């Protein structure tokens, strides 16, 4: 009598598996997301001489000394976009597996189609589409005015068939659009399920490593903006980037969340035009597009994104509340950080906003997570509360501690130099970040406590 196939219960949100069904996932706490899947042996586990030479593949394992391993770096090649290259750490590494995600309509397919059309003039590329027909892709390329003479296209959703064709074509870069519609014959579940996404991603990663083909996989995102599919998907790939942008804005930000070949949290900025995505070489000029009129509640700070400084504007609106519980709204900043800074301002600055509504926003849709924005945010709120504008040529950065001390931030010299390059002539920074030699024509105020920063603000 044949054995019944093994089954497991897997959460569709996070990929956690359980021996039996339950209503709520213990890992991500989502309800009614656990489904039954049939387990099947992956064909990649079986012995296959074609896949030897990559960790986890078949073949005879050989122990080597670390000193005997060649240190020759794989030569990168450019995508044709300097901002895209920056996010990837300097270009595409042959044999790497890259995952790019983003909301529907963000421009993932457009960016990759533009990239492949540029690279097709120099090397062999392959664009595999499973969501659109070849005619639809051709219409989009024609609308964008892209050179399509040398770009190879394939409409297929079977991973085994795609890899067979890719082995014949031998492209240097291949795009899979998207990983959620691909499937493997030996996995008994529908495309887009946790098991299918996990196995197809592992199959493509192994193919990339053993053939030296760089593969870019397009991934969907969930309602909260994170990459859809099991968490193991992000573990098996080399680089994970997210293309983000507001629906009412033409600017798009490309940020790396994982990168084995470069810096994490590197940021690239693009603008959506009629000819597709165009890179923005000077993002600070966009995020600082302020008018000539000076307004209260606005401050400029320097954030560190990956390997470069970026000037952004923080706006704050403090107004008397008509409700028993005043509102605290933060866009582009952490809500908990705002609550902490309001408490510090009350305790160590002598300013209480218990009866005030507080709204803060980072202009341009940039999300600031580092604590160097603390001092700029506090001064913006004080400026709005007192209805007194900060000078246009003033830049502020610094971390604020719970005791009211102003802590230094990394790369202080580079932040000050970036501000001076854009015409700022005054700066309020932590005392430990004051350079020995300030940029010519720039006045720097070093502060150690919150009270010192408020005193400087009063004297400006």
Swiss-Prot record:
Write out the GO MF terms: ATP binding; ATP hydrolysis activity; ATP-dependent activity, acting on DNA; ATP-dependent DNA damage sensor activity; damaged DNA binding; single-stranded DNA binding; zinc ion binding
What upregulates it?
Answer: Part of the serB-radA operon.
Deletion phenotype: Increased sensitivity to methyl methanesulfonate, mitomycin C, phleomycin. Has a modest defect in RecA-mediated conjugational DNA recombination; double radA-radD mutants have wild-type levels. 10- to 1000-fold decrease in survival after ionising irradiation (IR). Double radA-radD deletions have nearly 10(6)-fold lower survival against IR and the double mutant is more severely affected by UV radiation than either of the single mutants alone.
Region (Lon-protease-like) residue ranges read 357-460
Record has Zinc-finger as a keyword: yes
Q: Does the keyword ATP-binding apply?
A: yes
The motif RadA KNRFG motif: which residues?
258-262
Q: What does the UniProt keyword field contain?
A: ATP-binding, DNA damage, DNA repair, DNA-binding, Hydrolase, Metal-binding, Nucleotide-binding, Stress response, Zinc, Zinc-finger
Record GO biological process:
DNA repair; recombinational repair; response to radiation
Pfam families in the record: AAA_25, ChlI, Zn_ribbon_LapB
Please give the function described in this protein's UniProt entry: DNA-dependent ATPase involved in processing of recombination intermediates, plays a role in repairing DNA breaks. Stimulates the branch migration of RecA-mediated strand transfer reactions, allowing the 3' invading strand to extend heteroduplex DNA faster. Binds ssDNA in the presence of ADP but not other nucleotides, has ATPase activity that is stimulated by ssDNA and various branched DNA structures, but inhibited by SSB. Does not have RecA's homology-searching function.
Q: What is this protein called?
A: DNA repair protein RadA
Tell me what organism the protein belongs to.
Escherichia coli (strain K12)
Gene designation: radA
């Amino acid at each position: 009598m044949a054995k019944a196939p093994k089954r497991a219960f897997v959460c569709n949100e996070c990929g956690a598996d359980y021996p039996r069904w339950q209503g709520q996932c213990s890992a991500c706490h989502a309800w009614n997301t656990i489904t039954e899947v049939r387990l099947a042996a992956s064909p990649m586990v079986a012995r296959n001489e074609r896949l030897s030479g990559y960790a986890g593949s078949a073949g005879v394992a050989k122990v080597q000394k670390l000193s005997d391993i060649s240190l020759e770096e794989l030569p990168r090649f450019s995508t044709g976009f300097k901002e895209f290259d920056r996010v990837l750490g300097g270009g595409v590494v042959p044999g790497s597996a890259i995952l790019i995600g983003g909301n529907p309509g963000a421009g993932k397919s457009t960016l990759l189609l533009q990239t492949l059309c540029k690279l097709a003039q120099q090397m062999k590329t392959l664009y595999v589409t499973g969501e659109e027909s070849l005619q639809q892709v051709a219409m989009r390329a024609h609308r964008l005015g892209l050179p399509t003479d040398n770009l190879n296209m394939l409409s297929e959703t079977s991973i085994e068939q795609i890899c067979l064709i890719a082995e014949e074509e031998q492209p240097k870069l291949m795009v899979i659009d998207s990983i959620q519609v691909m499937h493997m014959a030996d996995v008994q579940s529908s495309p887009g399920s946790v098991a299918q996404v996990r196995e197809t991603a592992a199959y493509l990663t192994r193919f990339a490593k053993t053939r030296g083909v760089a593969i870019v996989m397009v991934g969907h995102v969930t309602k909260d903006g994170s990459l859809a599919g099991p968490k193991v998907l992000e573990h098996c790939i080399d680089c994970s980037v997210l293309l983000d942008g507001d629906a009412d804005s033409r600017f798009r930000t490309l940020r790396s969340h994982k990168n084995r070949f470069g810096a994490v949290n590197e940021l690239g900025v693009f603008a959506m035009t009629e000819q597709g995505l165009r890179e923005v070489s000077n993002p600070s000029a966009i995020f600082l597009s302020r008018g000539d009129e000076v307004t209260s509640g606005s401050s400029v700070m320097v954030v560190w994104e990956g390997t470069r400084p970026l000037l952004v504007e923080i706006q704050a609106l403090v107004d008397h509340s008509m409700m028993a519980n005043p509102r605290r709204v933060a866009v582009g900043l952490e809500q908990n950080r705002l609550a902490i800074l309001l408490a510090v301002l009350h305790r160590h600055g002598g300013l209480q906003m218990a009866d005030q509504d507080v709204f803060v926003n980072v202009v341009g849709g940039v999300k600031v997570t580092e604590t160097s924005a603390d001092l700029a945010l506090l001064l913006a709120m004080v400026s709005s509360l007192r209805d007194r504008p900060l000078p246009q040529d003033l830049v502020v950065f610094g971390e604020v501690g719970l005791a009211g001390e102003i802590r230094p931030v990394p790369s202080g010299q580079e932040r000050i130099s970036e501000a001076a390059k854009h015409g700022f002539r005054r700066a309020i920074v932590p005392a430990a970040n004051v350079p020995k030699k300030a940029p010519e024509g720039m006045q720097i105020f070093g502060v150690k406590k919150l009270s010192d920063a408020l005193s400087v603000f009063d004297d400006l």
